[in-house]
Amino acid sequence: MSQLNPKVGFVSLGCPKALVDSERILTQLRVEGYDIVPSYDAADVVVVNTCGFIDSAVTESLDAIGEAMNANGKVIVTGCLGKRPEQIREAYPQVLAVSGPQDYQSVMEAVHAALPPRHDPFVDLVPDYGIKLTPRHYAYLKISEGCNHRCSFCIIPSMRGDLASRPVDEVLREAERLVRGGVKELLVVSQDTSAYGVDLKYAERPWRDRMYQTRMKALCEGLSELGVWTRLHYVYPYPHVDDVIPLMAEGKLLPYLDIPFQHASPRILKLMKRPGAVEKTLERVQRWKAMCPEITVRSTFIVGFPGETDAEFEALLEFLDQAQLDRVGAFAYSPVEGASANALPDPVPEELKQERLARFMARQAEISAARLEAKIGSVQQCLVDLIEDDIAVARSRADAPEIDGLVHIQNGGELKLKVGDLVDVEITDSDEHDLFGDALPSDPAAQPPRALNLQMV
C-alpha cells in the first residue's frame, strides 16, 4: 500500500445496528483509497461513531471523543449522539464535524474536507461484501432503520427516525455476498425486525427465480436458501412472530428468538407503551416451545421503572418462573434525555432499583443454570469463535455472539479445530452461563457437508 494514502482512525461504539453503520463507512473509505489504521498516532483524522441511548452510553461516547481529541486533535463525530450536536460541541468545540446516525454522506464529506482522497483503483481492492468489523465467519445483516413505536423509555425514533425497510431483494443479495465471502452465520438486526416491510406495504421483489414479499417470514425463507445459520434479533412481540416458528422447527432458521418483553405488569407495560397482555405472552412462549422444542428465547427487561411497586416486581419474578426463558438481560431504569418516561411520577429510589436488579438476575441465573444443565449428555452443533491453547471456544445454535453463553470444547486442540468450523459437541458439563464438552470426530462419509446454495450476482 502506498505510503501516500491518507490514514483514518476509527472508533465504533454502541449496538450491532451502529456497528453495521461503521462497516458501511469503513467500506466507503477503503473504496476511496483511505487506509484504516489502528492507532491515533498513525491517523491523519479520527472518526468516532457514537451511541446516545442511555446515560452511560453518552458518557462513554464523550469520553471516546475526548480521548481522540487529546491523542490526535482531528476528530469527526457521527452516530446517535450526533443528534445532539450542541452537547458534543459544548464539551469539545474543536471537533471537525458532527452528524447523526446513518448519515454516511455527511461523514464522507467531512473526511474529504479534512483529508482529500488519493484513490488508486489498481491497488485499493475491497471485497464485494465490504469491510467487516466482525470475525469473518459471522456478520450482522441490517434489514431496516428506525422504528414506528414510541416506547416511553426510548429515544431511538428521535435519533434514527421512523421505520425505513430495505427492499427484500437488496437484503438477500447482500446476504448472498456475505456467505460467498465466508460468513457462516447471519445475524438479522434492526430496531424492530417484526415490522420489517410494513412501510413498503410488503412489496414483492424478485430474487433468483421467484418473488418474495418484503416481510419477515418471506425474508427468512429466502435466507434459508443460503445454507448458513440465520439468527433473528430485536423481534417485537407481534402475533405474526408465530409464523416463523415452523421455519425453525424445519431447520431452515436457527431456533432462536431475541424478543424484548421489558416487564410483566400490565400497568407498567402500559406506562412503557408496550404490549400488555402478559397471559397471552406466556401462552405464546409455551406454544413456541411446543411447536419447536429446541427454541431458545432471549429477552430483556427493565427493573425499577417509575411507579413499579413491590407487588409488580414480584409479578416480574413470577413471570420468569413461568416463562422459563433461556437467556435474559436486564438493567435498572435510568432517565434518558428526551424520553417521555422522565415525566412519570413515583420514581423508584436508586438503592431499591439496584436491589431489585440483583434479585432479578439471581432468579434468572438459577433458571439459566437449570436449563443448561439439562443439556448435559446432548450433542450440540457449534460454531468455533476462538482458539485458546488446546481449547476451542464456540457457540451453540442457542448462543448469539457477545450477549449469550459459550461452549468450551476441551479437545479442540487435539482435533485441530479452526475458527469458523462447524462441529458437533457432546456436552459434559455446564454452569449458569456456559457449556463444556468434547467435539465428536467428523465422519465425512456419514455426514457430508451441506452445500451452500449460492448463485453469482
Swiss-Prot record:
[4Fe-4S] cluster 1 binds at residues 15, 51, 80. InterPro entries: Elp3/MiaA/NifB-like_rSAM (IPR006638), Methylthiotransferase (IPR005839), Methylthiotransferase_CS (IPR020612), Methylthiotransferase_N (IPR013848), Methylthiotransferase_N_sf (IPR038135), NA-bd_OB-fold (IPR012340), Ribosomal_uS12_MeSTrfase_RimO (IPR005840), rSAM (IPR007197). One of its GO terms (biological process) is tRNA modification. It is found in: Cytoplasm. It comes from Xanthomonas campestris pv. campestris (strain ATCC 33913 / DSM 3586 / NCPPB 528 / LMG 568 / P 25). SUPFAM superfamilies: Radical SAM enzymes (SSF102114). Belongs to the methylthiotransferase family. RimO subfamily. This is Ribosomal protein uS12 methylthiotransferase RimO. GO terms for cellular component: cytosol. [4Fe-4S] cluster 2 binds at residues 147, 151, 154.
